């Protein structure tokens, strides 16, 4: 490859400048020419080539450059497709996981469809137990209160009778009723009868009945009929309403389970044929009965 070399005359004026311009050495001029030639031409070309050959070579170089550009674009496209495939794979994995979770949830709900019925039964039992315990608490409190009142009243009557018997004994001795005269005979008989009565002969049953009657009388006199009726309606009405509500809920839930099973499970004919899913339950039952009758015949 022959390079073009230009002879630059060296001035005799001096090494500094010619007409106030800096003087460059010869090798710097050659270097700048090579640089400009490399910038203009993608490849160094032979000077001995004809203009047609030069144009042909330039066109081939341009074609090569054009062909090299799509490679980068294809790489970009391939990278984009890889990214898209990765995203699609990740999205498919997420969808599969969600589907598996939904299938698991649906299986669990299908297996445990009777959980609301069981829970409602336990809630009804707890509510009834709470109401019954409150009612029994007040009832036992009233009963124990009546027993304490009866016991205290019996003890009080025993003490009174003992004191009365002691008074009768003192009077009997004071008037000398051991040898009574006809004037004091009746009085001595009464004092003797009073003295003979002891505290063990107190009628506990009569006293208990008397105390119970007094308590009921006081209870009714202090509490109005409206309050009593309201309390009874509150207790028994809450029991009846709660039991009716829980029973109605269980009945409707069991009916919904029956309808769901009839619609979800396809009706199967004994001849291993399945009915279409768009038929109603009545038509399915009729067809099943007809098929079973045909097989029996």
Swiss-Prot record:
The keyword DNA damage does not apply. GO terms for cellular component: mitotic spindle pole body; nuclear envelope; nuclear membrane; perinuclear endoplasmic reticulum membrane. It is found in: Endoplasmic reticulum membrane; Nucleus membrane. It is a multi-pass membrane protein. SMART domains: Brr6_like_C_C. The modification Phosphoserine is found at residue 90. It holds the Pfam family Brr6_like_C_C. Residues 57-69 have a biased composition (Basic residues). The chain crosses the membrane at residues 126-146, 203-223, 228-248. Residues 1-91 are annotated as: Disordered. Involved in mRNA and protein export from nucleus. PANTHER family: NUCLEUS EXPORT PROTEIN BRL1 (PTHR28136:SF1), NUCLEUS EXPORT PROTEIN BRR6 (PTHR28136). Belongs to the BRL1/BRR6 family. This is Nucleus export protein brr6. It comes from Schizosaccharomyces pombe (strain 972 / ATCC 24843). The gene is brr6.
């Amino acid at each position: 490859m022959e390079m073009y070399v230009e002879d630059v005359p060296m001035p005799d004026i001096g090494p500094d400048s010619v007409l106030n311009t800096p003087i460059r050495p010869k090798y710097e001029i050659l270097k700048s020419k090579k640089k400009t030639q490399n910038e203009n031409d993608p490849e160094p070309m032979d000077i001995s080539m004809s203009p047609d050959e030069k144009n042909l070579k330039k066109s081939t170089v341009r074609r090569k450059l054009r062909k090299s550009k799509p490679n980068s674009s294809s790489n970009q496209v391939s990278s984009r497709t890889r990214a898209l495939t990765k995203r699609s794979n990740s999205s498919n994995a997420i969808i599969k996981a969600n589907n598996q979770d939904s299938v698991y949830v649906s299986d669990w709900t299908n297996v445990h469809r009777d959980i609301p019925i069981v829970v409602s039964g336990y809630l009804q039992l707890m509510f009834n137990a709470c109401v019954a315990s409150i009612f029994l608490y007040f009832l036992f409190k009233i009963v124990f209160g009546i027993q304490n009142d009866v016991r205290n009243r019996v003890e009080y009557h025993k003490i009174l009778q003992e004191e009365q018997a002691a008074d009768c004994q003192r009077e009997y001795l004071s008037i000398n009723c051991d040898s009574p005269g006809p004037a004091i005979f009746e009085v001595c008989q009464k004092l003797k009868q009073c003295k003979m009565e002891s505290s063990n002969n107190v009628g506990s049953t009569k006293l208990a009945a008397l105390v119970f009657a007094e308590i009921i009388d006081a209870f009714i006199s202090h509490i109005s009929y409206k309050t009593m009726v309201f309390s009874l309606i509150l207790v028994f009405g809450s029991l009846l309403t709660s039991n009716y509500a829980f029973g109605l809920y269980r009945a409707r839930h069991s009916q919904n389970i029956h309808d769901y099973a009839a619609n979800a499970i396809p009706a199967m004919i004994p001849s291993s044929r399945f009915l279409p899913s768009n038929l109603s339950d009545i038509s399915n039952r009729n067809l099943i009965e007809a098929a079973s009758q045909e097989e029996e015949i």
